[in-house]
Regions:
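Active-site anion-handling motifs in enzyme catalytic cores
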Residues: 1-308
Length: 308
């Protein structure tokens, strides 16, 4: 039986591709890519798939095809999708593959409430191996990745309605919070430290292959840094896997869609508001190692699944 991983035809977030790379690294041969939103439509020979990541944009497409044999590990259900995923049919599907390995405690508790056996695994990106991404030509001191991007107004292309009006009202306030957060960062970084800014969001249209290349490049940037400051979990967690010190800034993550994703994952890194930066000495931040038991457990379960 062939192996597969989750892929993303329309995502502009490198974090999605970084999660897929973490899954792909377990296979000797190139796995099949199946789009997360089209799992229900798969109608070829049976495949084994590592079912990890954020689910999903189109929950009406749940559950997946019967020709897909999943290992649920590092699995997250978005709060806005939970009602459509956890229908009677969806619950019965998940029960066939329990226990479900959950990326966060929010998903674990959600599944436990409907009598699905579930446990916390953390994120599959914790299994990434630094050796693969060492690059002597990259020497970052402080790497700042996508801090406070959710506080910046995004391009709006939907018709005017009440929600749009509310968003337009919020834009000046969100931009003020963004500028305030950035000032807090710069104020607390010594002028003799070299700082590099990169984004986890892809700004222009790229092919799927190019997106994976960009994700690999971002992992190299993280692996060859002395410190990572970010508001993105899939920049923070690879840094933890690589033994790179991390400061996770949680400004703008108050909505349930955001804080549900970090429930439990914040055990692995220092999570603070930018206003608290003056209370810590970033030179003394030591990377935690409490992820190792979770990383080893996920690796063992995946290897057993592949070799079955």
């Amino acid at each position: 039986m062939k192996n597969a991983i989750i892929s993303y035809n329309n995502s502009n977030n490198l974090g999605d591709y970084i999660q897929s790379i973490a899954a792909k690294n377990f296979f000797k041969k190139e796995p099949i890519l199946i789009d997360r939103e089209s799992l229900v439509n798969y109608n070829y020979k049976k495949v084994k798939i590592i079912m990890n990541g954020w689910f999903m944009e189109k929950p009406e497409n749940w559950p997946p095809s019967e020709k897909i044999i999943p290992l649920f590990i590092s699995f997250h259900i978005n709060p806005t999708a939970e009602k459509k995923i956890l229908t009677k049919k969806g619950i019965n599907y998940l029960r066939k593959f329990e226990p479900i390995g959950c990326r966060d405690n929010y998903t674990k508790k959600l599944l436990n409430k409907v009598n699905i056996k579930a446990y916390f695994t953390g994120c599959l990106t914790l299994t990434l191996n630094k050796k693969k991404y060492i690059n002597k030509s990259i020497k970052n001191d402080i790497l700042i990745i996508s801090v406070f991007e959710r506080l910046l107004p995004s391009s709006i292309n939907y018709e005017i309605n009440f929600k749009l009006i509310l968003n337009l009202i919020k834009i000046p306030f969100k931009y003020f919070l963004y500028k305030k957060g950035m000032r807090n960062i710069l104020k607390n970084i010594s002028s003799n430290r070299n700082v590099k800014h990169i984004s986890q969001i892809i700004k222009k249209k790229e092919s799927i292959n190019q997106k994976y290349i960009l994700a690999e490049n971002q992992l190299k940037e993280i692996a060859n840094s002395n410190l990572v400051i970010t508001s993105r979990i899939h920049s923070a967690l690879p840094a933890i896997a690589f033994g790179v010190p991390v400061v996770f800034l949680n400004d703008g993550l108050d909505h349930i869609n955001h804080f549900s994703r970090i429930d439990g994952l914040n055990l692995f890194f220092k999570s603070i508001n930018s206003s608290e930066l003056s209370n810590i000495d970033i030179k003394k931040i030591i990377p935690k190692k409490n992820h190792l038991d979770f990383s080893n457990l996920m690796s063992e379960k995946i290897k057993n699944f592949i070799n079955k």
